[in-house]
């Protein structure tokens, strides 16, 4: 199935990317500059990155900015820890993409024990797997700073994430493209956004949500709607990079694969953009319901959560426009603002020209 999809995609050299509106407010954490600088310094030190190219690649990925861009409120020290956590998970996620099923299961056992504090890495292990050392340091802080119920929820998310990453890796090895519904469920877990977004929002803002609230249907749907918005945006704006590395587990690829043969790739792009808007509408609807519930029951923490959690979606959207992880290094397009236009699928960088453009004389285009 993957080979057939790859052949269809080989004929796609460009598509039109429309403006993606978002009515959810966007703002960074007030201390984002310091948090980003300190987190980057920590990650470079932990990973022993000294090579100039690898350093540039790490810094232009903007990993340290992700958490301050999606969680604009909260205690600075906790926001920095959340940023370190996100940096760590980016590294672990990249490594996990190449796991065999056996390697994945072994890594799951180690990481879960490290997270629980029942296994301490040796110096030799830290040297061999610096990402595990990063993870161990962050988890130690979480265990001491998170309330036990919140940490228990985090651990549940972690187990689901690790299991889903291994499952997805096995599908990729088998060159199997899942159904849209299967992919939706799998992607919610492999994104790890319930933890990176929802739980970190509670943690940074020191919110105490009752078990009956977090298990209520509206709250669960609210969390999922934000996750869906995040992964749809990420799959759309990372498509060039995913195509380059031949990773076909992506909303665009899955929808295109299972669409009728006469469906154009542009129709697939338009469908994903439509799904992003549907997710935003659901977020806003559920936000109002939960704010109203919080006000009626006197649950101030629920009101705070419902007010700020949607910023995960708007912050992720903005971050997805500025990361070199998706768009290539030293790309002048990444000026902090959203972009739209005809996207030429150059392997090294995102290239956008006004809608309807042909390749022309753009200095990067060799298609």
UniProtKB/Swiss-Prot annotation:
What InterPro entries does UniProt report for this protein, alphabetically?
Answer: Isoprenoid_synthase_dom_sf, Terpene_cyclase-like_2
Sites where the protein binds Mg(2+) 1: 93
Q: Which pathway does the UniProt entry assign to this protein?
A: Secondary metabolite biosynthesis; terpenoid biosynthesis
Asked if the Swiss-Prot or TrEMBL record annotates the protein with the keyword Chaperone, the reply is: no
User: Does tRNA processing show up as a keyword for this record?
Assistant: no
> What keywords appear on the UniProt entry?
Lyase, Magnesium, Metal-binding
Positions occupied by motif DDXXE motif: 93-97
Q: What processes does the entry annotate via GO biological process terms?
A: terpenoid biosynthetic process
Look up the EC number in the record and give it. Answer: 4.2.3.137
The GO terms this record gives for MF are:
metal ion binding; terpene synthase activity
The top EC class is lyase
Give the co-factor note.
Binds 3 Mg(2+) or Mn(2+) ions per subunit.
Binding-site positions, Mg(2+) 2: 93
Which cofactors does the annotated protein need, by name? Mg(2+); Mn(2+)
**Chain ranges passing through the membrane:** none
Q: What induces it?
A: Not regulated by alamethicin treatment.
Q: Which reaction does it catalyse?
A: (2E,6E)-farnesyl diphosphate = (E)-2-epi-beta-caryophyllene + diphosphate
> Which residues are involved in binding Mg(2+) 3?
234, 238
Q: What job does the chain carry out?
A: Sesquiterpene synthase converting farnesyl diphosphate to (E)-2-epi-beta-caryophyllene as the major product, and to two other unidentified sesquiterpenes. Has no diterpene synthase activity.
Please give the family membership noted in the entry: Belongs to the terpene synthase family.
Anything noted about its domains?
Answer: The Asp-Asp-Xaa-Xaa-Asp/Glu (DDXXD/E) motif is important for the catalytic activity, presumably through binding to Mg(2+).
- UniProt-recorded name of the protein: (E)-2-epi-beta-caryophyllene synthase
